[in-house]
Regions:
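N-terminal beta-strand motif that seeds the catalytic metal site of vicinal oxygen chelate
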Residues: 1-21, 69-71, 122-127
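Vicinal oxygen chelate
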Residues: 1-3, 88-127
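Core segments of cupin and vicinal oxygen chelate
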Residues: 10-52
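Short acidic/glycine-enriched loop/turn segments that link adjacent beta-strands
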Residues: 39-43, 65-67, 98-102
Length: 127
């Protein structure tokens, strides 16, 4: 089984779009990339990290325990890993669909959120 990191998702306060772009884009030099149309309402700002990883900065109010902070793992077979998690007593759950990127979320034993996905083609082009 092949597993690697696809993105890191971190919170940012409402109204911080300029500061987010200034720090990650201007200061750190990360190129901004468009988020899929299906999640634009979430006011996320995405940056490219290296060749195939991403940083997702999402608006969260208030910043606190009920967070959507998570990391994403690319897996060969989304259905297989979902079945394994279900069989082990975990509760995978679905979120907004991104075309070309089947995915689901699940909490680890400590409550951390993990996104599991497969990348099918160039999902940023499949809008």
């Amino acid at each position: 089984m092949s597993v690697h990191l696809q993105h890191v998702s971190i919170p940012r306060p409402p109204g911080s779009e300029d500061k987010t772009r200034a720090f990650y884009g201007d200061l750190l030099g990360l190129p901004e990339i468009p988020a899929p149309n299906s999640i634009q309402a979430a006011e996320v700002i995405w940056f490219r990290l290296g060749e195939d990883a991403e940083l997702h900065c999402f608006r969260e109010k208030p910043l606190g325990d009920a967070s959507n902070r998570h990391f994403c793992l690319v897996v060969d077979d989304v259905a297989d890993i979902r079945q394994k998690l279900n069989a082990a007593g975990y509760a995978p759950y679905d979120v907004e669909v991104i075309p070309g990127r089947p995915r689901f979320f699940c909490r680890d034993p400590f409550g951390n959120i993990i996104e599991f996905t497969s990348i099918v083609g160039d999902y940023l082009e499949l809008q």
